[in-house]
């Protein structure tokens, strides 16, 4: 309702997690199950952080970006594993990585990581609705932080986004 008032459309949330629904102007009539950060949450900060950290731990991310990550977070690979597997709220920890990556969008590796994450959201979530016939609007910290890239990915699907808000 916050994004559409009395208008029908597809509402999408991209933050720590992700979700989407079709709102008919009065109520939510369809929802694609989010799946959480382990089984879904495509496009979210947690999934972006998960893929980046996986690449960091395997030495696949660019050396400069990895070095900056370890310096800024003051964390070792073992502490990364501890934060993900043994501490509370690993999804929140993973999501904090997305804010770090926002400073590196000019790096081809980071840019492709973001693009892939957002494309997966559109493919696995948005495309399950009648998306060509309704407006699609986004809310959430990740959607807002990556708005230019989000608009680019939406354009690849023939979608023009008119609203991207940080908070509802």
Language-model features: locations:
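Phosphate-binding/catalytic loop of phosphoryl-transfer enzymes
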Residues: 1-66
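ATP-binding/phosphotransfer module of carbohydrate and carboxylate kinases, centering on a glycine-rich
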Residues: 3-4, 8-10, 53-168
């Amino acid at each position: 309702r916050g994004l559409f008032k009395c208008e029908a459309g597809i509402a999408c949330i991209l933050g720590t997690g992700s979700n989407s629904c079709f709102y008919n102007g009065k109520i939510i009539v369809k929802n694609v199950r989010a799946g959480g950060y382990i089984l879904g949450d495509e496009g979210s900060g947690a999934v972006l952080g998960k893929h980046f950290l996986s690449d960091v731990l395997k030495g696949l991310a660019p050396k400069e970006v990895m070095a900056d990550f370890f310096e800024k977070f003051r964390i070792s690979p073992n502490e990364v594993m501890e934060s993900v597997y043994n501490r509370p709220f690993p999804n929140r920890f993973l999501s904090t990585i997305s804010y770090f990556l926002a400073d590196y969008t000019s790096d081809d590796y980071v840019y492709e990581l973001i693009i892939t994450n957002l494309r997966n959201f559109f493919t696995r979530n948005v495309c399950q609705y009648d998306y060509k016939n309704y407006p699609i609007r986004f809310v959430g910290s990740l959607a807002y932080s990556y708005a230019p890239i989000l608009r680019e990915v939406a354009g690849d699907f023939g979608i023009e986004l008119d609203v991207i808000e940080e908070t509802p």
